[in-house]
Structure formats: structure tokens, C-alpha cells
Amino acid sequence: MNRREFLSLGTCAAAGVCLADAVPVVTPEELANADFDAALKVIWETTLHDVEKRKAALGVLQKHIYAMKTGRPFIQALDRGLTIPSDELAALHAKHPVIRWADEAFDKVVRELKETVVTGDVPAVWYLYNMGVVVKTKTCAFAIDICHRKAAELAPLLDFALCTHAHGDHYTDAFVAAMRKAGRPFVSNFVLIWNWYCNEAVKDLEIKGVRIHVTQTDHNQYLPKSMLCYEVFCPGAKPFVIYHTGDTNRACQIEGKLLTREPDLFFAHCAIGFSFPEACRNTVRAKLTVPLHHQELGHLGGRWRCVGFHEEPARILRELGDMGLKAAMPVWGDRII
């Protein structure tokens, strides 16, 4: 068992979550790679707004995620990164098509990042995995919480990266090393890089014309002030504002910390206790709210990995819809804007 697996076990145990037993049982008869391929084709041919068109396909993909049971194959692939031989990778993709989906999603985001030209004030925004988003403005490209086995390939395309906290489902060592090798800023509260280390209650940065208001919150009662929240003002006559709260676990934690009450995009954890209705009533009324951290495979079980499309995220979308707010739930590789 490596360090990442050990920490994943500890996190689940601390939360009182049974590991493999927390995952719904899926029988081999329910799984077929042909069905998975057909479902994934639907995803690539639709957008996050095509909820009904995607519904059946998402159910198929979720079964394959549950079938991985502990998530260990994903964790091992994440740790090995780009060193997996091609023949071994092909076998891994065949046995666990969910990992192939994650890789195809990464390739899609990289391809579209290269091809997309942004001319106005509204950036292009993609969802990669877990809490990871990639943003391209008219002047630069950046990312938040990038965790993927191929993440190092993304570094040369970015002008900087932000990380909310030091948990292995929000960054990889290979990505940090690639950012440093490329001479790109990596902002965090755990990597000691001159100018880009943040451990203050409030800090303001500017990189490539992007203004970043950084504040602290708690991950949980055992990890106080361990989270960096980023309120990002993309350059433009009317700055496009992205607010990313990482694994902040209580809505009251963000009260009084935003410079604007109405960001354009609001990202928060869907299954850690964070109340989206409370946050939207009291603090942030975004033009689009996006719950993330569903289908997280890096933990060895427990609700974080097993949150499916028909559970917490779906409930959050209903609650926000009842409040007259717009919300969306992307899957890996989706372009959000």
C-alpha cells in the first residue's frame, strides 16, 4: 500500500465510512464494454445541459465506476502517471474502461484548450476530474486543482495553476514538478515557492492580468484553515469571476470573504457537508453554480468516490432550481462555458 492509498484509507476511516462496503454491488452480468462505449459516445456527442439525453448513458457509466469497488486500480495508475507502458495501458483500459474515459477526457480538454480562441471577456472553462477545472481567457490559460495521471502534459499549456489544499485528489507531484520545470507559478499552501506560497487568512495576487483573491476556510473540524478558496477575476472590461472553494465543508466558512456576491461561476464540493442553499441564500448568488467532487476515484471507497449522478449532485441541482438559480453538473471532459 502506497502513501496515497494509506491517506485515502485514513480519510475514509476518520469519517466513519466503511470502505468497499459503501459501494453498491454491481454484478458482472450488468457490465459490458460495448455498453460502456455506447454510453461514452453519447457523452461526447452531448453537453452538460443535455440532461435527459444523457440520463441513461450516465447510469451505465456509473455502474462501471461502482464495479471498480475500491478504486485501487485508478490510484495505482495515477501514481505511475506517464510511465505505464502502452501494452499495459491498453490492458488497463480494457479491464477498467472508466480509466480510459478519464484519459480520453484529459485528451479532449487538452485538444480543445489548444484549438479554442477566446476573444471576448468570457473565458472557456472545462471540467477535468474531481475538483479540477481548466480556464482559457483572451490573455492566458490556468487551472485549479489538477489531478490526473497525465497532468504533467498540461503544464506547458498553462500560465499558472492554483491548488486548494494538499490532498492527493487535488494535485499530483508530477504536475507540480512539471509546472516548476516550465517556470510556471503554482499557488498553494504546501509547496514552498517564492511569491506563490499562501498561508495568510487573506492574500491578493495578480498573474498574467488575472486578479486572484485568496482566503482560508476549514476542510473539516480536524483540518482548520487548511483550505485556500480562490476568487478569480479574469481580465476584461467586465471581469468574468470564478469562485472555487475546494473541499470547504461549511457554507458559513465563506461568509464575508468574497469581493463580489455574484460571481459568474461557483464551484464547491457536493458531498462533504457544504450546504449550497445556505451559501446561495447568505453569501454567493452565482450566475452558474457547479457542484463538483462527484465520481472521485482516488479514495479507497466511501461516499466521496461513490457519489453518483442520481444522488447528492442531483439533489443540489433540484434545490438550487427551486431557488430560481441556474446550476449544472458536468462530467469529465465537459466544456462548462
Language model segments and positions:
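Structural recognition of the beta-strand scaffold that forms the well-ordered cores
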Residues: 243-244, 265-268, 289-291
